[in-house]
Amino acid sequence: MTNHWVDIKNANVVVVMGGNAAEAHPVGFRWAMEAKNNNDATLIVVDPRFTRTASVADIYAPIRSGTDITFLSGVLLYLIENNKINAEYVKHYTNASLLVRDDFAFEEGLFSGYDAEKRQYDKSSWNYQFDENGYAKRDETLTHPRCVWNLLKQHVSRYTPEVVENICGTPKADFLKVCDVLASTSAADRTTTFLYALGWTQHTVGAQNIRTMAMIQLLLGNMGMAGGGVNALRGHSNIQGLTDLGLLSTSLPGYLTLPSDKQTDLQSYLSANTPKATLPEQVNYWSNYPKFFVSLMKSFYGEAAQKVNDWGFEWLPKWDQAYDVIKYFNMMDNGKVTGYICQGFNPVASFPDKNKVVRSLSKLKYMVVIDPLVTETSTFWQNHGESNDVDPSAIQTEVFRLPSTCFAEEDGSIANSGRWLQWHWKGQDAPGEARNDGEILAGIYHRLRELYRTEGGKGAEPLLKMSWRYKQPDHPESEEVAKENNGYALADLYDQNGTLLAKKGQLLNSFALLRDDGSTASSCWIYTGSWTEQGNQMANRDNADPSGLGNTLGWAWAWPLNRRVLYNRASADINGKPWDAKRMLIQWNGSKWVGNDIPDFNTAPPGSNTGPFIMQQEGLGRLFALDKLAEGPFPEHYEPMETPLGTNPLHPKVVSSPVVRLYEEDAIRLGKKDKFPYVGTTYRLTEHFHTWTKHALLNSIAQPEQFVEISEGLAKSKGIANGDWVKVSSKRGFIRAVAVVTRRLRTLNVNGQQVETVGIPLHWGFEGVARKGYIANTLTPNVGDSNSQTPEYKAFLVNIEKA
């Protein structure tokens, strides 16, 4: 989230799209209801299903799954054509006025630079025009034909209300009603907040879904505002912490990047990741990348990391390609993986194409499962009839189960969707032989290091040089790790005037103190300030709220630097006056920035040319994304890989995303509409949490049996009655479930045909105390978003018949 949960109450309009907050985030959803009940906010829901969220909405608009970009691009066009934008915000705080290269183009579904053989773009034309000083050219009158504003207007001109209705199946009147309410928040004293979740991310165009929404927020002037922003509702407790700490194959903690095999030395790596400002007088905060990286290496390797050895740069692995789950299981399926350590995951139930996952795991020599519960992954080799029809005697994979603790059995911090790090304390000891994950990993690490020390072997140095200075080396305490994340001064730190800022050995209170000379250590720079010499800031429990905005700065700690709303400089105009006095976050008092949040902008007074989006090279919000996304610098509608239309109404020659990575063996397992004519989409229920809570008796009583939802029209055409058992199949497999016939799903008229949706809750499997069921991801395709490789769980093709 750019904002936070409590801030939702400040919105005038709450849009839930790409999620079902009332069902999947019932506690957090109270703040949407607070906005509705106490701030007279309008609640809008755009969803393929009439959900529990929709049941309390003021406006509900149905949409075909996988067409969000068309809907949102239609909103962009409406705002532009009706001049419903915050013009001053757009002019001064976005890149609307910057000029784009003359060779950038878009035609028939493709941007300039496309290589059909490689299925990727040469993105060199997706850039600004630059002057002799290396700065982007600008036309503040917004009249130049190559300025971002005019290129955007041209690009979205196709997304008329009629086109939205034709592609999305959303009735034109419903769409225009949504546009009209959103447009009302172009006024400086009104804001919209967008709440989204996996309903946007789990598509082959997931990142572009989110980006299109962010562009709407920029046009409306809602970024940086209380009651505004881009707000992801994270799907797991502490999944925010997972991404913060870089648990992805090409990431390092704090959103740093793991070096690639093309970055053979430290200088080439730092040059590639340290941007230069593209407009004068910009903060360009990523210019501090070397400080963050060197401090990370000092935390990793301690005294072994020195300037003479490039701070241990050679000890980091260098990636040749992203090893996401789709890639990794494809390698596994092809016999290229020997072992798999599975920590806190249930791939058999959670990853796409369950039958391929089981087949892949069957080709391993060994697998280690670290989990508090018995998962389908840990017992994938057992036969459970139709739902997991395997031959155990043919599977030679040796499975090691290491029982771990759950959150209630350990101390530590949890990072929520709003970037708040909240410390929690152990409620009880773990049962049996269960150990926390840190203790388990420490045990593996020490045994590996001892083997390398005594026997040698390839890649020994990174393990042998690693710093491991915990009081109990076999059991690092959460407090020690948290302080390590925060960071220490390794020498006395002085400012340029000779003033002492921190003594050697002290915990740091700001990442502004991090250095690239080896005098500081921090294993996650964005967490610096979370545990200072004043104590554990994450344990703060003062919920005083003098502003009434919900920015309880004394409750827990938010990264960065306890700031609750990112880019809050944009909440004030260029003169430092808040756009809306009653929603004031920061303002200029004549000498400095002050207010109801931690200012993210301490460097320049009003009247300077310094933009509010301090992490960007140009200091501006990007309506034109440059080369940052795989599909293009503007969002474009591409059909899901399995489309019920068989074409793309906008450009039939380019139906789906042209840059999707698709393995041959997965391509042949994609279905066509002649055999699988209905759209399948997966989702969650309030009564369960993924595949965990089928181990809990109360949850299993509340929702005991697997079911799917279909419309009354589809039920009638297939002869299915409410309560009948049905078989739902895709090109990859089938499941059996009870049919729930409901008006919550509509038959949509799309491009001259009727489109039906089959709703598939995902919680069942063959483990736990709940009634045994089929794994929903038996049906889903093994293809993902081209940027994140998040699988396309939300739009695929199925058939349904009475069982």
Question: Residues of each region from the PLM?
Answer:
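Phosphate/diphosphate-binding loops
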Residues: 369-375, 380-382, 390-392, 429-445, ...
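Short beta-alpha connecting loops at secondary-structure transitions
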Residues: 55-63, 378-380, 387, 403, ...
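A glycine-rich phosphate-binding loop feature that marks nucleotide/adenosyl-phosphate handling sites
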Residues: 92-96, 181-182, 197-199, 229-240, ...
